[in-house]
């Protein structure tokens, strides 16, 4: 993901000592491992560890592009192609992964694909040396930019499972409560200062 930092010029004008507000200084993607949910669906795939599935994406002009994702909720088409919900094709060593529609499909931890016990292909799982060279594409995909270095993935592939969000709900809720309390405390300080100034103004008026 591309980190976005605040490079806007600072103003030389100072009004009092209170900050005039806040804004986002940096945005980044958390690539940490999410929890795994067992679905039992043959074409639901999850990566245990680092790495990405390789996808062939066709744009509206009919041009093909390679993108990468950790979203493994795949399905099989009537022709046997393995695709995501948008019709993008999962890539194997042979290109688009295609399997017999009437066979029992087993995919092992290394990405080897078996049809009725016979090895037919190998799913491509890759990784990158520095995720700062990945640009977000759509909701769940990434595109490497100039300078990206592709490396071998150390993650294992889990069939019949899906990776869930890596957001820690309890932690985020705790942080939100802490922020709310800090806001309330600051609000009370402002109210106290306002009351003090009001009393001072009224006292001066009586003098």
Cite the ranges covered by each PLM segment:
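Amphipathic alpha-helical polymerization modules
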Residues: 1-207
């Amino acid at each position: 993901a591309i980190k976005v930092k605040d490079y806007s010029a600072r103003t030389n004008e100072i009004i009092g000592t209170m900050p005039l507000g806040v804004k986002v200084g940096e945005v980044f993607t958390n690539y940490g491992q999410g929890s795994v949910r067992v679905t039992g669906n043959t074409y639901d795939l999850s990566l245990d560890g680092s790495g990405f599935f390789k996808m062939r994406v066709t744009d509206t002009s009919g041009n093909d592009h390679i993108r990468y994702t950790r979203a493994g909720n795949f399905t099989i088409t009537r022709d046997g192609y393995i695709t995501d919900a948008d019709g993008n094709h999962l890539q194997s060593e042979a290109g688009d992964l295609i399997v017999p529609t009437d066979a029992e499909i087993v995919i092992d931890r290394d990405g080897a694909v078996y049809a009725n016990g016979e090895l037919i292909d190998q799913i491509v799982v890759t990784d990158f040396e520095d995720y700062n060279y990945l640009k977000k594409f759509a909701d769940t995909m990434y595109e490497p930019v100039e300078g990206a270095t592709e490396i071998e993935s150390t993650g294992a592939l889990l069939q019949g499972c899906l990776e869930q969000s890596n957001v820690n709900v309890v932690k985020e809720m705790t942080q939100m409560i802490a922020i709310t309390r800090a806001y309330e405390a600051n609000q009370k300080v402002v109210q106290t200062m306002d009351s003090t100034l009001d009393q001072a103004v009224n006292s001066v008026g009586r003098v």
